[in-house]
């Protein structure tokens, strides 16, 4: 028989790394075409003008310009990029 009792191991003591989501370029910032503006899960922020959406719902700029966050309706936000004039 064992002289010492075997050490138990814990099963639930793991965590995944953070996904680095969120706003990458804020309102008023100058962006180039292709710059990522927001990384998100689902469409927390919707598309405005001159922005595109990747398959993981990442919003990116289609033109060089300035980022502007706007209200789409009562409880939805959108982000647009307008050419710097």
UniProtKB/Swiss-Prot annotation:
Signal peptide: none annotated. One of its GO terms (biological process) is translation. InterPro entries: Ribosomal_bL27, Ribosomal_bL27_CS. One of its GO terms (cellular component) is cytosolic large ribosomal subunit. Residues 1-23 are annotated as: Disordered. The keyword Phosphoprotein does not apply. Pfam families: Ribosomal_L27. GO terms for molecular function: structural constituent of ribosome. Keywords: Ribonucleoprotein, Ribosomal protein. Belongs to the bacterial ribosomal protein bL27 family. This is Large ribosomal subunit protein bL27. It comes from Aliarcobacter butzleri (strain RM4018) (Arcobacter butzleri). The gene is rpmA.
């Amino acid at each position: 028989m064992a002289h010492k009792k075997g050490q138990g191991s814990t099963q639930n003591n793991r965590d995944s790394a953070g996904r680095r989501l969120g706003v990458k370029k804020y309102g008023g910032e100058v962006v180039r075409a292709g710059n990522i503006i927001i990384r998100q899960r689902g469409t927390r922020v919707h598309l405005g003008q001159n922005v595109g959406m990747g398959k993981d719902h990442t919003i990116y700029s289609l033109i060089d310009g300035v980022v502007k966050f706007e209200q789409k309706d009562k409880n939805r936000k959108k982000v647009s990029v307008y050419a710097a004039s």
